[in-house]
């Protein structure tokens, strides 16, 4: 179990600058969620530049990066959101963490425990936050379940098997349909 410690980083009286690495379905959800809070992504980078430009235009993103290296080199970037395919995560994590950027990475954060240990170590070495985008921890049902487990309502637990599903609007463009 990875514990994420809070690391404070001074951002001079401004909102943190987020960059999305990837601009697929889940990155669109992040951009929409930020819009609802009156915020915008600072930048976007994608392996297909045309998609990055379209994403930036759609969400009013200030900067389109042409490479991930450029993202890491930009001192204005505070947090990188990684929503690329799973097998690419460690590649981007290594670069972002070594550059001193905070990272929120989609699940699964890495392909194996060795990659995860490496990423955690890099985050510690560079004093930045590394987090996996696990939303279930914040859902009311899981908070209630944890409360009941801690209170011993289920007796001594040896094994827990859980399934989770959520309703999604039908969308033929979504790979899950």
Positions of PLM-derived features:
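N-terminal Rossmann-like dinucleotide-binding module
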Residues: 11-59
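Hydrophobic residues in well-ordered beta-strands that form the structural core
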Residues: 20, 65, 105, 130-132, ...
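Beta-loop-alpha module in the N-terminal Rossmann-like domain of NAD(P)-dependent dehydrogenases
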Residues: 30, 62-120
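Short, conserved SAM-binding/catalytic segment
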Residues: 55-61, 122-125
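Rossmann-fold dehydrogenase core element
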Residues: 118-135, 155-159
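Predominantly a Rossmann-like dinucleotide-binding segment in NAD(P)-dependent oxidoreductases
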Residues: 136-177
């Amino acid at each position: 179990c990875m514990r994420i410690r809070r690391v404070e980083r001074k951002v001079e009286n401004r909102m943190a600058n987020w960059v999305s690495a990837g601009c697929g379905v889940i990155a669109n959800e992040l951009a929409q969620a930020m819009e609802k809070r009156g915020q915008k992504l600072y930048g976007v980078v994608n392996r297909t530049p045309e998609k990055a430009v379209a994403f930036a235009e759609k969400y009013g993103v200030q900067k389109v990066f042409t490479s991930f290296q450029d993202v890491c080199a930009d001192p204005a970037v505070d947090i990188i959101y990684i929503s690329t395919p799973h097998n690419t995560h460690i590649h981007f994590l290594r670069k972002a963490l070594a550059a001193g950027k905070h990272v929120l990475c989609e699940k699964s954060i890495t392909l194996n425990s060795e990659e995860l240990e490496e990423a955690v170590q890099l985050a510690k070495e560079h004093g930045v936050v590394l987090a996996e985008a696990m939303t279930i921890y914040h859902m009311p049902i899981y908070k209630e379940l944890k409360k009941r487990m801690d209170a011993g309502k289920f007796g001594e637990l040896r094994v827990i098997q859980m399934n989770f599903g959520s309703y999604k609007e039908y969308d033929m463009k979504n790979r899950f349909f």
